[in-house]
A protein has these predicted regions:
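Short, surface-exposed, charge-dense and proline/glycine-enriched linear segments
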Residues: 2-8, 31-34, 93-102, 156-170
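Tryptophan-centered motif/residue detector
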Residues: 18, 27-28, 48, 75-77, ...
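Short secondary-structure transition/capping segments
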Residues: 20-26, 110-113, 169-177
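Polyanion-binding interface signature
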Residues: 33-147
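Ampiphathic alpha-helical segments that act as solvent-exposed interaction surfaces
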Residues: 116-126, 146-177
Length: 177
């Protein structure tokens, strides 16, 4: 919000002076951001905003990870203290599932070190692990059938993400030596 004053110095013409009375807050910035979003992108933004709230209520999680700004995208990255890899949490509205993985940037050797322990990693995650190797990046990936489009499933999804992210951090600490 602006306030306009008219100033005059001596015999000069009056000139406007603009004073900022109120600056935009995060709410107005968020509103500008979401104006052009699709329904699916709005859902993603709401989902990750809710995840940030769930994260802040979990002491084990907040000791290990820092929240980042919720964005209207299908992934949410968590730093685990290495520039070589991070934890990626994903939602898939088309397949009605969610996933979590260690995402390794351009380091096949590191991926192979983890893969040497694939049975133990699968046991730790209590899940069948998909070992995805691509040209630039590799992923140690798991999914579960929780539909991110159904808001009543979100608490279950958040709990799954919180649990699996902590386990992935334990995996990284144990096998990245």
């Amino acid at each position: 919000m602006l306030e306009i004053e008219f100033w005059q110095i001596g015999d000069s013409a009056k000139a406007p002076r603009f004073n900022i009375v109120e600056r935009p807050n995060d709410w107005s910035k968020t509103m500008k951001t979401i104006e052009g979003l699709s329904d699916t992108d709005l859902l993603k933004l709401e989902f990750w905003t809710g995840f940030n709230e769930a994260m802040s209520d979990n002491n084990d999680f907040t000791r290990n990870f820092h929240a980042r700004k919720a964005m209207p995208q299908h992934w949410y990255d968590l730093s685990i203290g290495s520039s070589a890899y991070h934890i990626a949490l994903t939602i898939n509205t088309q397949k009605q599932s969610i996933g979590a993985d260690i995402y390794i940037n351009d380091d096949k050797e590191l991926f192979e070190r983890f893969k040497m322990h694939k049975d133990e990693i699968s046991t730790m995650l209590n899940s069948e692990v998909e070992w995805r190797e691509a040209k630039k990046a590799c992923r140690i990936f798991i999914t579960t059938n929780i539909n991110p489009k159904k808001r009543d499933c979100w608490p279950k999804a958040y709990n799954w993400f919180l649990e699996k992210a902590i386990i992935y951090k334990e995996i990284a600490s144990k096998f990245d030596k």
